[in-house]
Regions:
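Beta1-alpha1 glycine-rich phosphate/pyrophosphate-binding loop at the start
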Residues: 4-68, 144, 153-197
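Predominantly flavin-linked oxidoreductase catalytic cores and closely associated redox partners
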Residues: 104-105, 111-208, 213-222, 288, ...
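Hydrophobic alpha-helical scaffolding
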Residues: 56-59, 63, 132, 187, ...
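FAD-site-proximal beta/loop scaffold in flavoenzymes
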Residues: 114, 136-146, 248-299
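Rossmann-like nucleotide/phosphate-binding core characteristic of flavoprotein oxidoreductases
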Residues: 1-5, 82, 317-417
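A Rossmann-like FAD-binding core segment of flavoenzymes
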Residues: 68-97, 174-260, 354-386
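A conserved FAD-binding loop/helix module that cradles the flavin
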Residues: 292-336
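FAD-binding core/adjacent interface of flavoenzyme oxidoreductases
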Residues: 1-9, 67-156, 232-239, 250, ...
Length: 417
């Protein structure tokens, strides 16, 4: 068993940003474990632009954004292992992994950062009726086939789900010569960013059918068509069926944080996000185990992933240098009146720096509301927002000094503007 200071599980955007921040914060013995054949994670197949506006103040493609961090990792001489699968994470932070070169090996780090990212919700989790023919892909799989493998999955396409990947693939398939017939969304609102709806659907004349879902798939060897129906109260409305002749169905029905390792180690998970429940330092219930990026909760922009992961790297460095976290009272963070979840779920005011960052999503579309944060019964933050939607994550930065004092909880809520 080898002793190291910091092990980062995952070499995607979160893992890279965390490693760079930890090294700059003084941690020398860092090891990144990545199961793929190259660093960068999902960014390597995201060849569209729109990345880096917050982090680098310029517009980059996914591979360009990843390359900026990979370059920093190499310049800082941070060690990493590719084609390495982490098999187990124990409660005492022992990491068991294997690869072709080293075989089966174990590491005992002082701290661990979870940066495994997320995966797409598959067809089996959607309970779509019909046959199981060829031609049904998750949007991310189709993205990899088109952008990295040079294969076009189909010619006539219907997309179920209006998440950002689905919207982007509607545009990408159109640019590659396919005909995207429509994007169907179960909810009465889109799950993606407004800018993606405009740039990927409106600009290409692709219809977005809200409150619709797939009720049947035709075809045995290959998809020959699908049937959509309008949805009310979560159920298809009889008599509203529409048939589309297509050879491909892409699924963009949400992302699931990949937390099998976390669960095996005993990390407490947030039932809403599916990711670890963390405090203001992005530390889980296991001391010295931190989480950041899409393994924690699904983000809209990779810039926010990098920002969050850098904070996790800095907190891990402080934990390693101090040998543990400082003591202090712990305040739960509660959600009310339309706030779906928050990260973090607990705050230790005495352990926070100058500011505490709260990230959250709402559970529906709200107009002319005010975001309010209470410490006990005292309002310590408020901001008016003309529109709030589930597809866009909200960020609130609180002064840590306002969190100290009487009161048994922090409450994030929506009020009339």
């Amino acid at each position: 068993m080898k002793n190291v200071d910091l092990v980062i599980i995952g070499g995607g955007p979160a893992g890279l940003a965390a490693a760079v921040a930890a090294r700059k914060s003084g941690v020398q013995d860092i090891l990144i474990l990545e199961r793929d054949s190259e660093l960068g994670g999902i960014l390597n197949q995201c060849i569209h632009n729109g990345f880096g506006l917050h982090t680098f103040k310029e517009e980059l493609t996914g591979p360009e954004y990843a390359a900026r961090f990979v370059t920093q990792v190499r310049e800082l001489e941070i060690e990493y292992k590719l084609n390495t699968m982490v098999l187990d994470l124990a409660a005492d932070k022992t990491v068991t992994a294997m690869n072709k070169t080293d075989g089966l090996f174990q590491l005992h780090p002082k701290a661990v950062i979870l940066a495994m990212g997320c995966r797409e919700r598959p067809r089996g989790a959607l309970n779509i009726p019909g046959y199981r023919p060829a031609g049904i892909f998750t949007a991310g799989t189709a993205q990899r086939l088109v952008n990295m493998e040079g294969c076009l999955p189909g010619r006539r396409v219907v997309i179920l789900g209006s998440g950002d990947i689905g919207l982007i693939m509607a545009r990408r398939m159109t640019l590659e010569g396919a005909k995207v017939l429509c994007v169907a969304e179960l909810m009465p609102y889109s799950g993606g960013l407004k800018r993606n709806i405009v740039q990927c659907l409106d600009d290409f004349g692709i219809p977005l059918k809200l409150s619709h879902t797939v009720v049947d798939i035709q075809g045995k060897e290959r998809v020959t068509g699908i049937t959509l129906a309008r949805v009310e109260n979560g159920k298809p409305v009889p008599g509203t069926e529409e048939r589309y002749d297509c050879d491909t169905l892409l699924l963009s029905c949400g992302l699931l944080p990949e937390n099998e390792l976390s669960r095996a180690a005993g990390v407490a998970l947030n039932p809403v996000t599916g990711g670890p429940a963390v405090n203001e330092s992005l530390e889980t219930n296991l001391p010295g185990v931190f989480a950041a990026g899409n393994v924690l909760h699904v983000h809209d922009l990779v810039d926010y992933v990098s920002e969050e992961a850098a904070a996790a790297g800095e907190h891990a460095a402080a934990y390693i240098a101090g040998g543990g976290a400082a003591a202090g009272c712990t305040l739960p963070v509660r959600c009310e009146n339309g706030v779906h979840y928050t990260v973090p779920t607990t705050i230790r005011p005495d352990c926070a720096g100058d500011t505490v960052t709260l990230r959250f999503r709402v559970g529906g579309v709200y107009k002319n509301k005010k975001i309010a944060v209470y410490r006990g019964t005292d309002c310590i933050y408020s901001r008016k927002r003309p529109v709030l939607a589930p597809g866009e994550m909200e960020t609130v930065r609180l002064k840590a000094e306002l969190l100290r004092g009487p009161g048994d909880a922090v409450t994030v809520t929506l009020e009339e503007g």
